Amino acid sequence: MLEAYRKHVAERAAEGVVPRPLNAEQVAGLVELLKNPPQGEEEFILDLLENRIPPGVNEAAYVKAGFLTAVTKGEVESPVVSRAKAAELLGTMQGGYNIESLVSLLDDAELAPIAVKALSHTLLMFDAFYDVEEKAQAGNASAQQVLQSWADAEWFTAKDKVAEKITVKVFKVTGETNTDDLSPAPDAWSRPDIPVHAKAMLKMEREGITPDEQGSVGPIKQIEELQKDGIPLAYVGDVVGTGSSRKSATNSVLWFMGEDIPYVPNKRTGGVCLGGKIAPIFYNTMEDSGALPIELNVQDMNMGDVIDIFPYEGVVRKDGAEISSFELGKVLLDEVRAGGRIPLIIGRGLTSRARTSLGLEETDLFAKPIDPSASDKGYTLAQKMVGKACGVEGVRAGQYCEPKMTTVGSQDTTGPMTRDELKDLACLGFSADLVMQSFCHTSAYPKPVDVNTHHTLPDFIMNRAGVSLRPGDGVIHSWLNRMLLPDTVGTGGDSHTRFPLGISFPAGSGLVAFAAATGVMPLDMPESILVRFKGEMQPGITLRDLVHAIPYYGIKQGLLTVEKAGKINEFSGRVLEIEGVEHLSVEQAFELSDASAERSAAGCTVKLSQESIEEYLNSNITMLKWMIAEGYGDVRTIERRIKAMQEWLANPELLTADSDAEYAHVIEIDLAEIDQPILCAPNDPDDARLLSDVQGTEIQEVFIGSCMTNIGHFRAAGKMLEEFNGSLNTRLWVAPPTKMDKDQLTEEGYYGIFGRAGVRIETPGCSLCMGNQARVADKSTVMSTSTRNFPNRLGNGANVYLASAELSAVGAILGRIPTKEEYLEFAQKIDATAADTYRYLNFHKMGQYTEKADTVIFQEPA
């Protein structure tokens, strides 16, 4: 075992990274060595046991806990690990497989004091709390000590307060840093391996940043040079963390700028991030990881500056002179002290339970968020939805709450990290009502590591009562949306988890794991911006044009700027609430809610008609029954969701915003004013332009796909290509969002049309959108229906215009962005058959689905 391990250490050292944590097989070998250690290796193998095995309910932790428990019981002997040492090491494992053993040691006269100390600082107790409480009530003095320690929050007070002054050196990245810069999509395969993945951070050259190897390895030498004097680095940028909800982006920053977590291999906490604007999901993920994120003016901070941050005073000084000021939320410094927002929440809950058990009043030890001032105004739709999930009428902007998570989504490039986080949380079963896992980002062109994920992650999810899709099924959102319940709240490990029914607050994998495991999520209720559409859509104008009208009108009203220095984005961190499109189908509404991600909004609501929602739920009940017939699981979870949908349909009620609800801003968009398509220019989804401003630009590649598309878009493109009846000079990629779309398009003959036109047809899923597998040619100019067009996302040096499927199809045919007149000529023909083109997948009216759905008999009768 040691020989193989040392070989692995040498191989990793050659790559410039630390070794992987030990797996279960290696720990089993280590256990045998610990029983009979080779001479001279005692210290080394003890260090492996202590520091190189992941905590929680990891398979390796199971073997470790089993060995240590056996030693404490005297069933196994080791010259290296005494009974006392074994008990001490059980106390470093955070939770999960060590808990039962530690609780039982409270009855062991010799080891009880060690168990008391260990349990006093263990937060992941869950139902084992009652075992300790029971012992305490039965007179066990050690258990009473533990209960009192929890009540006194010694797990928190034993940690150092955040320092009055924090000295850091500036690592300045000018302009916008998106999560693709910090965690590049082509390197998604390595995300769970934090030290390896971190090497790709900022691997593309940009102002002030010099990668070790352009396109492969980031500025590690530059970082190491700055760190030579021992002053910790702080990540500083004008705009930081926009884009995808990748916890891997935070992991990479903290790998270079954070600090080790005792007894936890290859993971770091702490660190400081300063940004003129910090995207809300990234900010939350930093909070969860124990970092200190601060929004403030960074224009007087330059690469290599040594600055002093005074967190309690709210100022930053350089050479004694004040260069910036800020205001922190009251709870943030408690979060940093506790090692993150999630440990703080779990710890506060544990302290509260202990105090209740002991008959003590609520503690005043923790900082409390400031409650917003009382208001006699009404609530917005989002405030009512979150209120319902908290058991109250509504939640005011600025109010802290923990809404119930009805639906949680996970996809395959964040899923392996979410799995690790769930293990760290000692989660063996989900508390959220429905948790769904997809395989949409990696199924088309999987690497061996992806294939392993495809084989292992479904069982992990279903064993915890989650629902697992299969590789090739399609995009997470196109499936998850069909599992939603009206007016409920959820989250997902993908920034485009933007429910068209209810509301969702997407998050990084750590917070998603917490939501899935506990069934709730921490939330500081954001303010809302109302977007109200009025009037009639003009001929040729699509929903994608309405999507782009929001930033276009935002720019016109001074609520949004494209310039990154001193960036204005009033949408950032707020909820987008959309009205005036009640007639849309839920599939169509998702196009609007989905794109709230590009605004860096915290969430989105869309006011829809009861008729649209009823049709959607009837369709989805059939789809979910069909899934059971097709062998999907967890069956009980799917059945429970079907019954909840049926209950809503039996008594349909929808929340509505109050007429006197308060909004941070109101944007009114007259559809009569939008008489030509609106695109987003390279390479910024905020840079909304009219078609006439960009017409004539030559196009080499076109992509029609992503969660922003539905079956109607592919019919529209197919009809244009059939009318064209020639060979394209552009490269056109087509990727339907689900296998159901693919099957229906095939049945209707559209795949034949695509084939004759030379279209590259992709597996249902994300395809080019994330850029983690297939990519467009370097430096090509592209029209795309994808979600965002950040630099290098779809291809290295590519210039990407975001546009509707209809406009993109015209671009593919012409080889350039058309004029308004050219486009409308094509669009007129599509409008003539709109009723046929824009039919959606109503499964309850499709025989191939109803026939199978009708065979399903529920395991548990209603």
Task: Locate predicted features.
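Amphipathic alpha-helical packing elements
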Residues: 2-31, 36, 332-336, 341-346
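Fe-S-dependent hydro-lyases/dehydratases of central metabolism
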Residues: 92, 98, 105-107, 113-862
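Helix-turn-helix repeat elements of alpha-solenoid scaffolds
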Residues: 24-25, 58-64
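Buried hydrophobic core positions in alpha-solenoid tandem helical repeats
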Residues: 30, 45, 63-72, 99-103, ...
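Short amphipathic alpha-helical segments that mediate assembly, nucleic-acid/protein binding
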Residues: 5, 27, 41-42, 64, ...
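Alpha-solenoid helical repeat architecture
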Residues: 34-38, 71-78, 90, 103-110, ...
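Generic amphipathic, hydrophobic interface segment in small proteins and small subunits
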Residues: 31-48
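Structural detector for internal amphipathic alpha-helices that build alpha-solenoid repeat scaffolds
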Residues: 15-21, 43-59, 73, 80-95, ...
